[in-house]
A protein has these predicted regions:
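Proteolytic maturation boundary segments
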Residues: 13-123, 130, 282-330, 336, ...
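Zinc-dependent metallopeptidase catalytic helix centered on the HExxH motif
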Residues: 353-354
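Peptidyl-prolyl cis-trans isomerase
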Residues: 25-26, 30, 200-203, 208-209, ...
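M16 family metallopeptidases and their MPP-like homologs
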Residues: 1-21, 41-46, 111-200, 212-220, ...
Length: 514
């Protein structure tokens, strides 16, 4: 497979023939060229007369050992939770907590081991509030678990370890997101730790410096990576917002400058001005819990955690992508990467949503059996990984959706990759799909949704989105009904509407193409 990935299976025999005909002079020339001091790893072998060895005893009497063994008390296996849309909606306890104003959605169910998953989203501010704030929001969230007024970072880690729980934070301009993974017994303790981190953080300069160093090092290591650079350039070509806007996408130099500008003073100021509940917060808890305890806890502990910044979503409306096909040269990189983006003016609530999702799966969603993977990986044998995906906007106003294609390959195969994408797009648009492809995609999509709803963390995310967009599980049920009713003709019509020839995409190729 390595030779196929390099371009052709017959390279294996060419390699064999070359090895057979190699001369001493050629080997010595290669030594001089490649075995240079800066490309060596040296180790020393120090022999000893009496090496110390470790002997592992072979166990005997295994049958007798296990014959009388009695295990621990059996763990509660939990209930067989029905992930049918109607059942989820019927089990969902939702509403708004009167004192804190938090919108909630709880599913109290008997989980194996009495596990529970919690997600808490706080939204505040508008686009003007977050102008010229750079990357500060992300740094504030990253520092929340690094220490509080009464707990050090180690204290927090020890306390969570003692109750076998985890607490995580993430944030961006306009949003801070907290999550807890725990058990019914330890959820109250985990909530106290999360609350302490969220309401009483202690921003330490040494912890800030560590995060800045890590992120700068990450940028430095990615500065010559074909995939990183190609994605960066694709986004910059389609830059919509001016510098300073929360949705502005900076280049690497600008990202470095933004990171270096972050200070403890900026962190504290951002926290003081934007952390707290204004008029938009949502709480989703799924698993084994005392519902009344959770409601009372958030009422008692977050009614005074206020922000005076009413929330207004930072809009990111649709704009047609720029048609381009650019190369980025990354010397000495064995892998090359191509990514393409095509904008699509549609949203989750549009009638084309179901067919467009299925079209995306057929074109590039499967690991080995999609159009893109079959052509570039199996038929041409030129890609280590190739595919496509459709990203459909949830916002009914922005309608900022897009289609993505990508491939990883050896630089020598760059032209073949371009030809493959070009021809497969043309064939997809002109000829459409088959009934067999449709049936396979429908079954895969429905099974995937069923599995996703059986995972508490993914179900939590789904319910959080429903709360935010003021909808319930009937939205997902309706989408599945639309997917199930799709025909070849409906999908083909959507393909012709949204898929375009390669020359209309924003395509960026990164690799050592010299």
């Amino acid at each position: 497979s390595e030779f196929i990935g390099a371009g052709d299976w017959r390279l294996a025999f060419i390699h064999r023939d070359r090895v057979e005909s190699t001369t001493v002079e050629e080997v010595n020339a290669a030594v001089q060229k490649y075995f240079i001091p800066t490309n060596r790893t040296i180790g020393n072998f120090i022999p000893t007369d009496k090496p110390e060895r470790v002997e592992i005893l072979h166990p005997e009497g295994v049958a007798e050992m296990v014959a009388s063994y009695k295990g621990k008390v059996a763990m509660d296996v939990g209930e067989d939770f029905d992930v049918d849309y109607d059942n989820i909606q019927n089990r969902l306890d939702s509403g708004i907590l009167p004192k804190s104003g938090i919108e909630y959605g709880f599913i109290n169910k008997a989980n194996r081991g009495e596990t529970v998953t919690l997600s808490f989203a706080i939204r505040s501010g508008n686009v003007d509030d977050y102008m010229n704030k750079g990357v500060t929001a992300g740094f504030v969230a990253s520092l929340l678990n690094k220490g509080t007024q009464s707990r050090s970072r180690q204290d927090i880690e020890d306390a969570l370890s003692a109750i076998s729980s985890s607490v995580g934070f993430s944030g961006r301009n306009g949003l801070v997101y907290a999550s807890i993974s725990s058990t019914k017994e330890h959820l109250p303790s985990a909530l106290k730790i999360m609350t302490d981190m969220l309401k009483n953080p202690k921003f330490d300069i040494s912890e800030l410096d560590k995060i800045k160093t890590q992120r700068l090092a990450g940028l430095e290591s990615s500065a010559s990576d074909p995939q990183f650079l190609a994605v960066q350039r694709m986004r910059q070509i389609n830059q919509v917002h001016s510098k300073g806007h929360p949705n502005y996408f900076p280049n690497i130099d600008e990202q470095i400058a933004m990171i270096k500008e972050v200070s403890i003073e900026r962190i504290q100021s951002f926290y003081n001005n934007y952390y707290g509940i204004s008029d938009n917060a949502s709480l989703v808890v799924i698993g084994s819990m005392d519902v009344d305890m959770v409601k009372s806890y958030f009422e008692d502990n977050f009614s005074d955690f206020k922000s005076d910044k009413p929330f207004s979503e930072i809009k990111n409306p649709y704009k047609q992508n720029v048609a381009a096909n650019e190369n980025i040269i990354t010397p000495d990189k064995k892998n090359a990467f191509t990514i393409g983006m095509l904008s699509a003016k549609t949203t989750e609530v549009d009638k084309d949503n179901a067919a467009l999702q299925i079209a995306g799966i057929i074109f590039g969603g499967g690991f080995l059996n999609s159009r893109v993977a079959t052509r570039l990986r199996q038929q041409d044998g030129i890609s280590y990984g190739a595919g496509a995906q459709v990203s459909i906007d949830s916002d009914p106003d922005d309608k900022n959706s897009n289609l993505i294609i990508y491939a990883i390959y050896a630089p020598m195969n760059a032209e073949k990759v371009q030809i493959g994408f070009k021809e497969e797009l043309e064939r997809f648009i002109v000829d459409g799909i088959t009934q067999e492809e449709l049936d396979s995609a429908l079954n895969g999509w429905i099974q995937g949704q069923t599995v996703s709803r059986a995972k508490d963390n993914e179900l939590s995310s789904l319910i959080n989105n429903n709360l935010y967009f003021d909808r319930d599980m009937s939205f997902q049920a309706s989408l599945e009904s639309q997917v199930s009713a799709l025909t070849v003709e409906k999908v083909n019509a959507v393909i012709k509407k949204y898929f375009k020839s390669l020359d209309q995409w924003t395509v960026v190729n990164g690799g050592d193409f010299q």
